[in-house]
């Protein structure tokens, strides 16, 4: 009997051991940013299709989850109140000091419990659930505690030198929210380099992108935001957990203001600098800030306002002291309006005696040559980490990254790294981290699509390093592969990806609106069509989209050509007046290629424009007629001719167009 008991016991132990070996706990699910803590369990939870809320404050969060889940999967969920059941997602607010304002807990078993101390934390938790459900219909069982390592996790977009539509900014906000990036800074004024405009400040573009009643006509005619539009944009961002930081940059980068009021410009250092000896400068800027910050419902709604202060000349002691006084004045002015001022770090560059009070303000630390981290920390400044050589992108520039390699960010950087100094992780004086995209090179052919292409990979890497920080465990190669599978955000396709290729239209009729999944075909595709040619007038359009037009006969030369935003380019090829032709357009991220009857006809690749002296024939750029009006032969810039092919509407053409096909390049 004793022997039988021993045998049975051994058999049970063996069975238990075998069962334990075969059962596997769920690995940490891949989401961006990476979860800061995960304890996997066994099995998955099938969704019931219900989102249960007990607190009315979470109703909108639940509705947002249902909306975005449907956009992502085509399936529906319903918001309900009452007792949770199997497969329900349950949202709750519970006081939890450990979580802070933005952290949350997940407990996924028979139900999925998402608890947070605030609606912000709950919203971020729903972004995690959406990513988990991106490629699978069930949720992995387990527990997560997810808490951001840094408060400000952001991106700065230069809208001063390049205008971006409200519709694009709203999509950008959706993308940022999907990756828990909570801060968008809009750089609202700036100017081009005068070298590219004949060395003449009057000819050099300078733009301010916000409507002003105080100074009618100040806002740029080629694109600006009304005050109502900016208020609406901020409210939209707030609904996604994002704060917008408006930036009005001065006392340098002010050409828009000195074009408007020439007497404010510096005769010694150029019109892109204010003359700080002129008291009218203070009057002008005081009134501008008053317009946007005064009253019960100010135009600048958020907690932060950026006052600029970067790259002003520091040639003399007197100039440095005037700059410091100017900086101090606007820090205190912004504080009087109840806001927290942010400024670009420049106080090592502008060293001096005039006090600049760090209390209640934040430095954007972008260059150790302008502001030394150890000195600024010792002086008591709170700081945003955004070291230029690590996190700056300048499209088509030769002096900064054109396309930022995000492997360095992911492998080596956190907001504790300021470029010249690494502070202790989560040092209380580190406000957070940001990256920036600057449109320095005015007129370089870069479109909103090219900008977005440069933003996306970096945004995902920055999201990880600002939220998860030093707790990151996913190897870079794995991150780089899997991040692409998450897409941009529910309902967002700024990359122009075309699903279910190939897409075919057998007979393209003129003057029609097309029902295709995209309005413009993104890079990495080829668009082919057959055309039985008839005479076409100059300006005859094949297709149009939100940002582009493709011509069968362009309005200038009568050749195949296209318009992207304000940029016009054409091939050196005109369709015959009769006969059959096969056309293929390849659109890559750096070129637009034309094939005629299967043969490569022309590549419209990037070209370099040299700044030339008008009287120096030897330096004249051959080829294209588009030239820069400038004089310095040592300066140059690249010009891009890449096309998102428009496919929203057809034009009024005479020729018969058939077999239009969209496929992979």
Question: Each predicted region: which residue ranges?
Answer:
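Acidic, contiguous N-terminal accessory segments
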Residues: 21-148, 341-350, 357, 485-488, ...
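Short, aromatic/His-centered strand-loop micro-motif at the edge of beta-sheets
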Residues: 561-584
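Extracellular glycan-recognition modules
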Residues: 502-563, 651-665
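Flexible glycan-contacting loops in extracellular carbohydrate-active proteins
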Residues: 602-659
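Active-site neighborhood of glycoside hydrolase catalytic domains
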Residues: 257, 262-362, 366-380
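Flexible, acidic glycine-rich loops studded with aromatic residues
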Residues: 355-361, 368-509
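Short tryptophan-centered beta-strand motifs in secreted/extracellular beta-sheet-rich domains
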Residues: 184-186, 230-237, 527-531, 577-598, ...
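Feature activates predominantly on carbohydrate-active enzymes
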Residues: 98-273, 280-282, 286-304, 333, ...
């Amino acid at each position: 009997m004793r022997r039988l008991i021993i045998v049975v016991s051994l058999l049970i132990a063996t069975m238990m051991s075998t069962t334990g070996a075969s059962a596997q706990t769920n690995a940490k699910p891949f989401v961006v940013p990476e979860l800061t803590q995960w304890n996997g369990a066994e099995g998955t939870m099938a969704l019931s299709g219900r989102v249960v809320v007990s607190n009315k404050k979470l109703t909108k969060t639940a509705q947002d989850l249902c909306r975005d889940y449907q956009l992502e999967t085509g399936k529906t969920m319903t918001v309900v109140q009452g007792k949770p059941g199997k497969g329900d997602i349950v949202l709750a607010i519970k006081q939890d000091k450990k979580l802070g304002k933005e952290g949350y807990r997940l407990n996924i078993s028979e139900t999925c419990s998402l608890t947070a101390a605030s609606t912000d934390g709950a919203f971020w938790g729903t972004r995690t659930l959406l990513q988990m459900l991106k490629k699978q219909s069930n949720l992995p069982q387990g527990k997560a505690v997810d808490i951001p390592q840094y408060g400000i996790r952001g991106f700065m977009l230069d809208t001063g030198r390049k205008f971006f539509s409200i519709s694009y900014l709203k999509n950008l906000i959706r993308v940022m929210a999907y990756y828990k990036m909570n801060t968008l800074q809009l750089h609202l004024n700036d100017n081009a380099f005068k070298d590219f405009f004949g060395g003449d400040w009057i000819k050099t573009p300078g733009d301010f992108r916000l409507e002003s009643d105080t100074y009618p006509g100040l806002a740029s005619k080629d694109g600006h935001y009304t005050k109502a539009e900016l208020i609406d944009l901020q409210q939209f961002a707030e609904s996604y957990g994002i704060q917008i930081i408006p930036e009005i940059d001065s006392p340098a980068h002010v050409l828009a203001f000195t074009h408007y009021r020439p007497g404010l410009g510096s005769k010694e250092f150029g019109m892109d600098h204010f003359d700080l000896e002129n008291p009218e400068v203070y009057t002008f800027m005081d009134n501008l800030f008053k317009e946007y910050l005064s009253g019960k419902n100010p135009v600048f709604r958020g907690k932060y306002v950026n006052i600029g202060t970067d790259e002003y000349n520091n040639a003399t002691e007197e100039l440095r002291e005037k700059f410091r006084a100017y900086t101090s004045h606007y820090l205190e002015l912004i504080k009087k309006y109840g806001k927290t001022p942010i400024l670009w770090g420049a106080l090592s560059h502008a060293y001096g005696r005039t006090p600049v009070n760090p209390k209640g303000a934040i430095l954007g630390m972008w260059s150790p040559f302008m502001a030394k981290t150890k000195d600024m920390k010792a002086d008591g400044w709170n700081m945003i980490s955004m070291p230029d050589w690590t996190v700056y992108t300048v499209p088509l520039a030769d002096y900064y990254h054109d396309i930022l390699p995000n492997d360095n960010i992911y492998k080596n950087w956190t907001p504790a790294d300021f470029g010249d100094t690494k502070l202790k992780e989560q040092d209380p004086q580190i406000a957070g981290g940001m990256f920036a995209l600057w449109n320095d090179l005015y007129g370089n052919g870069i479109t909103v699509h090219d900008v977005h292409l440069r933003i996306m990979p970096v945004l995902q890497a920055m999201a990880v390093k600002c939220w998860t920080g030093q707790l990151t465990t996913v190897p870079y190669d794995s991150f780089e592969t899997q991040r692409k599978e998450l897409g941009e955000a529910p309902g967002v396709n700024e990359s122009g990806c075309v699903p279910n290729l190939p897409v075919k239209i057998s007979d393209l009729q003129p003057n029609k609106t097309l029902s295709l999944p995209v309005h413009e075909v993104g890079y990495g595709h080829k668009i082919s069509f057959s055309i039985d040619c008839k005479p076409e007038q100059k300006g005859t359009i094949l297709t149009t989209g939100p940002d582009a037009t493709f011509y069968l006969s362009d309005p200038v030369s009568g050749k195949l050509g296209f318009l992207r935003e304000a940029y016009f380019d054409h091939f050196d090829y005109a369709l015959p007046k009769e006969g059959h032709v096969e056309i293929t357009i390849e659109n890559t991220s750096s070129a637009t290629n034309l094939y005629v009857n299967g043969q490569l006809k022309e590549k419209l690749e990037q070209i370099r424009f040299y700044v030339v002296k008008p009287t120096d024939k030897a330096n004249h750029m051959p080829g294209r007629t588009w030239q820069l009006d400038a004089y310095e032969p040592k300066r140059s810039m690249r010009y891009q001719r890449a096309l998102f092919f428009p496919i929203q509407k057809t034009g009024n053409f005479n020729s018969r167009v058939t077999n239009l096909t969209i496929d992979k390049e």
